Amino acid sequence: MNDQFLQGVIFDWDRIDNDSYLKKIKAFKGIQKLDFNKAITFFVGENGSGKSTLLEALAVAHGFNPEGGTKNYVFSTHDTHSELCDAIRISQGYRKEKWGYFLRAESFYNVATKEEEYADLAHPSAKYHEKSHGESFLALAQNNLHPNGLYLFDEPEAALSPQRQLTLLMQIYSCAKEGAQFIIVTHSPILLGIPDADIYCFDNGRIHLCEYEDTESYQVTEMFINNRQMLLDRLLTD
């Protein structure tokens, strides 16, 4: 039985203009529906493949601020989200999340600033700007992870060392075991290694489920580690 908060998304491409860049994204062509059957779902693919665009659309359609934060964050420093949010319908389950957060690396500074502005005596600021970038990014993620929550993360590994990624991995896994749901865009072979997750690959003109070992993130990392000198010789020799 699927007990996820977001059980899937249905696309209505008739609501998108024919000249929209969205219709030029190869992975989107022909896609009508995507199911979320696991507590943790990953989107992987090359830059520009549409994975962050879809995650953002899911977030906005579900009521989150396009730049990130909880549903209570209402601000806009640069309105750039796509119209895809108006062309999707989210299939929601019988459960309702008790907490939620949309975390994206590219607008982290703005969200951290707003967190300080929204702070009061009952909800003191975590002072993210007083920490290093990596420490503050991990702290923000940790402070907003709760059981039975819904979390949309866009490249959470961007500011994190490999060791910190392992810390985040453990917390995501633990939280998912307590009823939370995660949809995560990532290039990290570390995060992708979380057990019992679905991985959607955005490649070859489609969106499809794939195994961990079949992801480019894993294959390129493995190839580099196992054949570092040979690869460097090929890449760096004129």
Which residues does each PLM region occupy?
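ABC ATPase nucleotide-binding domain signature region
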Residues: 40-42, 53-117
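N-terminal pre-Walker A segment at the start of P-loop NTPase domains
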Residues: 1-32, 37
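Conserved D-loop beta-strand region of ABC ATPase nucleotide-binding domains
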Residues: 154, 184-185
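C-terminal lobe/lid and adjacent interdomain/linker elements of RecA-like ASCE P-loop ATPase modules
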Residues: 163-181, 188-238
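GG-anchored amphipathic helix commonly corresponding to the ABC/SMC/Rad50 NBD signature/C-loop
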Residues: 131-155, 163-175
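The conserved Walker
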Residues: 46-47
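Conserved glycine(s) of the Walker
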Residues: 50
